[in-house]
């Protein structure tokens, strides 16, 4: 990176990319009607005026539109990506050029990634709100508080975890800060009004902390808004999965045996995508309900111990760990392709490949590696087991991200304006806001909504203007 791409207020790949980024941001705005409508609705009131917001979310063109929406509503912002491969460098440069501190470039090391997350949180008086994706900013604060409390009790700097490489990096960073300021994270947590979390994996973390009484501030589960999970997770993945695989490999998908591991909303989108391309699609599942859904859609539901021997393309969608193991990959056919579209790189045992000296790693191009076994067999691993759609392509289309990000903005407004209503628990946005997000996107698609009569509304026992479904309705 050139020196002009690093300053106290930003770290990006190349500030010379800013104008390119600006042109793409303008294009994306035309496809993000929800965010643009929110800007117009709140233009005069600035409902986030004075709010200090930290973002830990993929630094893409679509995220740039989110950032500028939050800024137009009055917020101060600092931003980092939530994945080492997901940043679009021209988007980061365009945002840095506006004066918003942003710390992100495609291909960060893990040490840089956590340092940039730390920088995004480093307001002089601390952040008041967090926009999180995967929960890493939230994790850093909670783990920091935990270590500060341990230090206060024992007088000893806590040992660095060796459970995995990434946690070791996090703990080393926290220990350095501990020796500078032993109450840094506790002060930050006290000043936080809440977090809005974007994705399934991060939401799981939040509910786990809330159940254990460990959550330090209120949280909004944006992921489970219907206009997020049933659109971003399904329709977004249905398009961006194929985009990532195609850009990475140029492989013909028609006729291939494609195995989708997991059949939640993300898995459903991936299975539909492969089916639409003419692939022979199989699904693995642990949940009998999801397995039955897959079977009723015409997909073969199989066991991975068998599928690993004949599949051509594998994608993990579960949010779990060790879904594709080293033993699975040992028996895969020559030239099989392995990738992940869950948030973290834990679904595929990639370290068992990259750390094995008996295997040879051939980098075809960035984020595309062929792993060669001693007998000459090769499999292709995309994005080193991280998000294939963002590591090997540019993520979901702008329109579907407008759904998700409009929910994020509404959650941030709610936390900022009504923080006294919320305890240290996990909340979801009310149904009427979910329906509002959907309404904001209808005209862009030429949708004409039917309006019920008063008689019809009375018959169903719902308001004419909604909400139309009970909270437990599954869509």
Curated annotation (Swiss-Prot):
NAD(+) binds at residues 199-201, 233, 262-267, 285, 320, 341-343, 389. Pathway: Amino-acid biosynthesis; L-homocysteine biosynthesis; L-homocysteine from S-adenosyl-L-homocysteine: step 1/1. It is found in: Cytoplasm. It holds the Pfam family AdoHcyase_NAD. One of its GO terms (biological process) is one-carbon metabolic process. Its cofactor is NAD(+). Substrate binds at residues 60, 133, 198, 228, 232. Its main location: cytoplasm. It catalyses: S-adenosyl-L-homocysteine + H2O = L-homocysteine + adenosine. CDD domains: SAHH. GO terms for molecular function: adenosylhomocysteinase activity. InterPro entries: Adenosylhomocyst_ase-like_sf (IPR042172), Adenosylhomocysteinase-like (IPR000043), Ado_hCys_hydrolase_NAD-bd (IPR015878), NAD(P)-bd_dom_sf (IPR036291), S-Ado-L-homoCys_hydrolase_CS (IPR020082). SMART domains: AdoHcyase, AdoHcyase_NAD. Binds 1 NAD(+) per subunit. It is an enzyme of class 3 (hydrolase). PROSITE patterns: ADOHCYASE_1, ADOHCYASE_2. It comes from the Bacteria. Its EC number is 3.13.2.1. Keywords: Cytoplasm, Hydrolase, NAD, One-carbon metabolism. GO terms for cellular component: cytosol. May play a key role in the regulation of the intracellular concentration of adenosylhomocysteine. Belongs to the adenosylhomocysteinase family. This is Adenosylhomocysteinase. The gene is ahcY.
